[in-house]
């Protein structure tokens, strides 16, 4: 037996199984989506939108069962447990992912069998295997259960646990154990299950928001198996005698099997002596013993094994923000996450693939107790399975992704499992092996049988042996202890190397046979090849050790007794052994030579293999290219070229790798007399060729290369470019080398030149020195001969000669030097230039080389990236192709199913058709038979039943036949219908009972008679009632169908919003927080449930009604079954019914909007302040009018108001019909009837109203003509001059003139009939108050003429019709900038908030309307969408009011022009009032007004100072009115507490804050400014945290929010729009994609329908609120930038830098008739009105007195006091003018609806720019650059001036009680009445 085996196969990797649980009920309720996708047929999953793919060993979806997981993953681990390996199952995942359910660590009581986890199934499986192995093994089972709670180890099976937990210890071999842990012995599966239940009940659990039964600790349940074969030794000591006897018994049993080895190849070697034959026999015996070892059972090799199975149920990771854990739960979660973090670090370190190639990395096992306990399971002695449990819900996306990453990384962990043998048993096996080895050695050396040896050994007295092994060689002991038991079985015939000497054969050396078989022959050869010295030394030491071990026994015996025969034998053998050792040394050297030879062969084979692999790859590339590019349309040349490529590759000369190897081997063997068995050569060559299994890796690489051959073909261009770069680099390097050589040549030339120069200079110096020396010698000689004068001359001559000589020589040298320098100067300069150029060239070449190499590296990187992309694309395409194939297969299956269904339906249809034909035939027979039976009955039954008929009146004799025929028809119809309904029944009975005759299926005579009597009792219009019933049912069905469709659409909207919300939440990064997502999803889910309930209810109702309704085929069938004589009656009833329905529909449309109630009382008016009305009533004193109103109001309570249609044409018809009916009633009853026309409109929230005394209306009349005087003429002259100037300015500025009418010479007005007036008045509405009369009685139709015709203006006759018109529908008129800026309203309060039109007997009409005062809230008016045809003029209307003389008792205060002359407003644009704004007296008056005790006057109550710069914007939180937000140029946003006046918080901004807005629904505030950003602040949080920042292309000037949208106006004239629900990116809308303004956006506001924008380009644009489509551009524009916009009740007010304020409203046409004005002054007003005549009416005939003012009012200006010429023109006017005007108005009304027009212009509203506008309590407040604040009434007719700030007013805002203003003087002021 041997030591434990190290398993090195692929199964040692940690196996990972992924289990995805199904969605929980909570997740389904939250409508969570599954984010985990599966790959069919592959253990892969795909996560998220990025399609991240993870591959595991096993993948189980939510539908997998527990049994599947056990069979696929766990069963093989149980088998490994009984083989002696440790096993571990590790459950990993987040909390609530199903780990405990999968492992089964909970109690098994009450759990169904199919839901049992892994542990209960393992227990059953273990005991099943124990039942099978109990006969051969002795098994002991133990269990332990522990938990790790808060880093404390607890024993779950110990009833008295240790305080503080159990420690962790480590053995010397690195194994971790826990001392004190209870290992309970279990003897049955019930005991083991009880231990599991008891431990699971003691485990710590808790409840969190994510899991109600969350495990709060890590649990490890362990099963320990100790198995011992029954026949194996279990004791730790045995005597040598028992060992030898057992060995001899084994040997004797094995000798019976030696015969089959007699023909071994070893016997073929020559054997010449006995020794050789003995050696062969011994070799045969060794082979047989090896075979015995091979067949030795596992039980005998592993006698005592202890293995463990660990089940680890980890606590799930959790996030505090999801679990909302606190206190102890929070501490538990922190400890759990800490342990799992350490586990993740261990997995990451072990799973790092670089550990195999780099330095081993530290594994942080000691960071946590959990990792220390799992040390053996992760990277140690265990076979481990990790079950990763995840949740598929998108809400757990991040946790699922992290779990998959760790699990995927765990697959790279390599374990080292070994068979766990008991160490005592292992030592015994070692001793047995040594004893057996010694016996074999003695048997070979002594040539004796094993029995003789045993007897000799038995006769030797035993001596105590020390515990050390018998063999003293440490190598032998180490080999025996370290090598595995399987090495004994690896010896085979194919691995034997037989070497023969000269005289004797050599099978196996004694030394090698004496060694234990530690390795197979393959590995031994390789080892000897690599380390021959070690082999030699080991063999020699082993032989010497064996000899020394053999000599120990004789030494013992010699000391105790005389020499025995055994000692003699041993002595002789020792000499032989010495000789054999020498022979072994020779053999070792010979094996070394063979090893070298085989290594050379291996190298050659490797090279040949590479060549063949290259050729194979080329062939596969060519074939793959042929497959990819194959097309039947290819030319023959293409195929020829392809075959040539094949032939060229195949014809390359190659040599078989086996042939040269065999040849070389045979050559070497023949030369060295060594014979190698060919059968053993091939595996040896394979091992030597590619050690370590590299052959398989090369094959794999070849496969990969084949798979990537397509990618290589795609990179041909890049390869060519790469080769060009390489060539370019080589060329540049050669050029650089050449230039470097040139530089060296230049250096050499320079050195030669310098050397030459130096030589010449040295020569010159030498000559000079020689000259000086010669002259010195001559002077010395001359000094010696001073006295000899004869020699003086000689010396002089000699000196001259020497001087000349040396001078000549010096000159020659200098000439040579100059010549050398001059000749080489050009060359030198040229060399210098060449040097400089070469250096530059070198630098450039080096730079080019660097650039080229960089390009090369970039290209290589690009090629790698492209290759990777293409591989990914191929994988994706392959997956898509597989998916498409699967879809195609599914589609084919569906098509086949549909075909089968179609065939079945065709067969069924054919069958039904045949049955129908048979039924028709039977029906015809029944009809014929019925007619035969009915005819004799009719003559008897009809007269006898005339008295019982239920019709209105008895049947006359004259038409008795008709009644009879009708009854007969009814009877036949009923019979046919009844027979048709019972057709199936009768036919079935006929087919089932063939004996029944045909007469049995038809009704009897008594039945027919009874049915006929029943039909005669029904009224004649039976078909009519039936048709009405069917029509009603079908109408109800259609209504329910439409309702159902609407509910479905609403549900689709909510579902779409829920999907968008879920995408926004699951996107990375998430756009919504969890709380926001839960809140919005809960709201959408509630709506969806509500819609489902509505849909279910509608479907039930529709089903009930559908059962009663007959469809078209059924109706046609009933009609076809009706007799011919009944058809005329049916057709007549149908046509009459259609006509009646059409007539009823027409009348309903006409009277749909008609109601005749009396006016409501004053109290009801106060309760319904959202609408105002016009009354048309006869003129009477005020007291009588009020009494009449009270009388009418009492009668109005019992009337019902009908709904009015929104269409203008329907409104005209309704008013005409109402007035005509009213006049007809006056003619009959001579009573006063009132017509009230009220349009039901959506009610908008109104302004706060004052007391009822302030709501009394005033009746306006013009003053007497004598009060006007010269002031009127002066005013008109000034208007005329001003108008001419403005017309010139308009022409210069590009504006066309208003109309082509001569303004001061208008045509003569044409009188307008009352019908035309009423038609036009009903078609339009107005908000201005006018009074006009008409006197042309001949033009009034008879239906409008009163019964009592009088001409007295004071007539109190109540017979005149009263028309009540809702003031909600009246629209304000349009003001042009050229009109007079005056107040035209008086202050009379004679009416109760109603506009009254009085019609007297002379058809004099007076219209009265209450004014609006700046001191009271403005009444909310909702304008009717009407046509902007005519331009209104309030001043002209005031002149028309002045012509009415009915209200002479009014004071002069109602005179507009008198008030204009007496009390001019300070902001009038008349020059004589402009200078008052700058006078000191005026300012003093304002200051005095500040202190007066008037409740309606605004005062400054508080001032805030805190900004370091000017105020730019203010905003008030509507949800929290006590908080004010301010932004300024100091880059701060300040929060002010309005209760205390304190600055609560400062919010910093990157730039000046120009605009603020608050969205109440989301609780967010948006700020914009000069840094091209929009910040979002959460004002609901305590610190107003900044949520996000949006980038904008330009600075933000203004912000506005409504609904879910936020709109920002930018400085570049564009807009940005965000949806609050998805604020990641701005929306792309028509507003943002198309430029609508050319200048900066200064201001924005919102109406009920439109988004209003004002810009620097002087324009105002209207966009639809939801679609952001341009609706209208307001004309005419301002003359400078629009700085501010305010909206009051959908009326738009705009302020501009041109110091004006404009009022814009929906335009309308109001036709007012005035027949009584005859004043010259009114002619002037008429002239002024004519100036503003609408261009569309410019073609009015010249004799028409019809004038349209700027309030869209048509005034027929013919008064009773006109001159005779005007009367003549009026009397001669044709009536065709009125009809043409009416038709033109009607036609133009529909084309110009919903258009905003300017109806008020306020020039010089301020002395400087109008910076801001604000609405407060129904008034308009404006702030200007002149530091003033002004308050205006809604009509901009009067104002109140507030002394504002010390500097420019920059912003205004308001609440219900206060007005807030901000200025550039850094102050905020609060104003209150």
Curated annotation (Swiss-Prot):
Biased composition (Acidic residues): 280-297
Start and end residues of each stretch annotated as Disordered: 231-302, 463-567, 778-797, 841-891, 930-1008, 1179-1207, 1244-1267, 1328-1360, 1403-1467, 1758-1780
Main location: cytoplasm
An example molecular function term from Gene Ontology annotations: ATP binding
Keyword Transport: yes
UniProt feature coiled coil, ranges: 715-933
Domain annotation Kinesin motor: ranges: 13-413
Swiss-Prot/TrEMBL induction comment: Constitutively expressed.
Database matches in Pfam families: Kinesin, WD40
The keyword ATP-binding belongs to this UniProt entry's keyword annotation: yes
WD repeats: 1506-1546, 1548-1587, 1589-1628, 1636-1673, 1677-1714, 1805-1842, 1844-1873
The entry's keywords: ATP-binding, Cell cycle, Cell division, Coiled coil, Cytoplasm, Cytoskeleton, Microtubule, Mitosis, Motor protein, Nucleotide-binding, Repeat, Transport, WD repeat
GO annotation, cellular component aspect: cytoplasm; kinesin complex; microtubule
Residues holding ATP: 93-100
Localisation per UniProt entry: Cytoplasm, Cytoskeleton
Top-rank taxon, per record: Eukaryota
Gene Ontology biological-process entries: cell division; cytoplasmic microtubule organization; microtubule cytoskeleton organization; microtubule-based movement
Feature: compositional bias, Low complexity: 232-247, 473-567, 937-1005, 1182-1200, 1244-1254, 1348-1358, 1423-1454
Free-text function comment from the UniProt entry: Microtubule-associated force-producing protein that plays a role in organelle transport. Its motor activity is directed toward the microtubule's plus end. Cooperates with kif10 and dynein to organize interphase microtubules.
UniProt record similarity statement: Belongs to the TRAFAC class myosin-kinesin ATPase superfamily. Kinesin family.
Name of the protein: Kinesin-related protein 8
Organism encoding this protein: Dictyostelium discoideum
Encoding gene (name): kif8
